[in-house]
Amino acid sequence: MKKHILYALLLVFVTSFSATAQKNRINGIKFSRHHFVDTVKIKIWDGAVIIPVEINGQTRHLMFDTGAEFGFWIGDEEGWMKASGDTISVTDSQNSRLKKAFLTFPPIKVGDVVIENYPMVVDKGMSDYVCDRIDGAFGYDLVARGLSFKFDTKDSVMIVTDRKNYFSKEEKGQPTLKYLRCHKTRPMVWVRFPFGLFKLVFDSGAIGGEIDLSEDFVSRIAHADPEIRQKLDAITVRKDTTVITEAGLFGNSQDSVSYRTLHCPEVGLDNLILKDVWISTDKRLSKIGSTILEHNSLIVNGNKMHLVLLPHDGKMVQHVGNENKKGLKLLLADKNDTLGVLKAVVRKDGEAYRNGLRSGDYLESINGVLITDYCTYLDLMTEAMEQHCVFRTPEGTRKEVEW
């Protein structure tokens, strides 16, 4: 079952405020050292980078999220956080919009470097989905402030520096994704598809995501150019309607959407070629997700305004082969649903359908462990290799499936 019925964590902000306010807020951040290079041991969660830090005398874990313009904290506001006086209108990944206050955090120690006056938005909307794996995230504002990072996702090490050319030797000849900062200051990079060259958000906070295209985006470009429409139709293997669920900072949503499945013989990221890529257009945002970092380390160079991928095996051609042949996704049930925690969405051409599963069936247990909450499921999906799953229909019929 593993990643093919993966939870969809979209830790993404889309924000709107004046450039002057953004500049003043970034310039208020201070670092305890200058002209430094520091190495920090990190954790990798499904391609996402998790950084241990010390805040208020405790070890916390912050994800590095290139898809977020600024930092955010998942949980309740606590006494050691201080109001900064600045507010912002924030729209999260599922289009929920709220006006939030920036809170200034006490000094944050990352390795031997202390970050002072770092502001974050605080909300507990994601608490049910991260299951204590992370406490929050650093946003892309640290790069805008002049820091560069190397995330060695093979050996789980991060190098952070304020030296402008520190990574120059490592970057030579490697896949380089140059970007322009839009007004949201998130990295937008060029990606080559069989139907053209398009710019996507590089979002390291989209946990478990490879390459996502929204149906709105695909339909728009197909409508505008008959040649692109013809190329898209040539690689479209399925059109259907499905249920999607997305978790944002301010809650979660479910919706039925039209989508298509694209089978791309190859996708290009500069001179890195991804072969046999399957893309579903049932997401709201078009982006590259964290799964790219399961096979490639990453240099984030804010001074040169580019991202550099470092393939773990040194090869510039990588086989992805991410087709979901099982045709099964699991979505969180409503909190007041007394029949179960996770419900199946089953596609008719997949293995799950042939094994008797149907949309609306509830996942009861995995390897004999009852699924009573989302975090239990998440732990089992992380640990288990072969799984014996028991589902039940809303009427109570029991179904057993081996994955």
Locate each region found by the language model:
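Bacterial Sec-dependent N-terminal signal peptides
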Residues: M1-I26
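Pepsin/retropepsin-fold aspartyl endopeptidases
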Residues: T20-W403
